[in-house]
A protein has these predicted regions:
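Alpha-helical coiled-coil scaffolding segments
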Residues: 1-119
Length: 119
């Protein structure tokens, strides 16, 4: 499955994927790269999931992401939602607050794949 996501990465540029992220998250935010600090609180990844299936998100469980504990909770929730949607997730929760660029890129590819049914 990771090879599948790597094929998506190969067929799309980072700019294409970031464009989709920015399209989904407008007007609140604009990310410049997959190591953008705005990914650190997990809220952007949750918002990407809501673009696929809005009813899956319980916004009462999403924290402001201001503390390390909030970031951990949001990251775990984002991963949980992605798995419920059917994504194969390779990252662990602490890849998100640590801004592991490669893992966040693969997570976004998984969400992109679900949204546009590339498989």
């Amino acid at each position: 499955m990771r090879v599948h996501y790597l094929k998506i990465i190969g067929s799309k540029t980072e700019a294409d994927l970031l464009g989709w992220v920015n399209e989904v998250c407008q007007p609140e935010t604009e990310v410049k790269g997959f190591n953008d600090p705005q990914f650190a609180d997990g809220r952007l990844l949750i918002k990407l999931s809501s673009a696929i299936e809005p009813r899956i998100i319980n916004w009462d469980l999403v924290t402001p992401g201001e503390t390390d504990e909030d970031k951990e909770l949001n990251a775990k929730y984002a991963i949980s939602i992605a798995r419920k949607l059917g994504a194969i997730v390779f990252l662990v929760w602490d890849d998100i607050p640590k801004l592991n660029k490669k893992m966040i890129l693969i997570f976004v590819c998984a969400m992109y794949d679900l949204k546009f049914n590339i498989a």
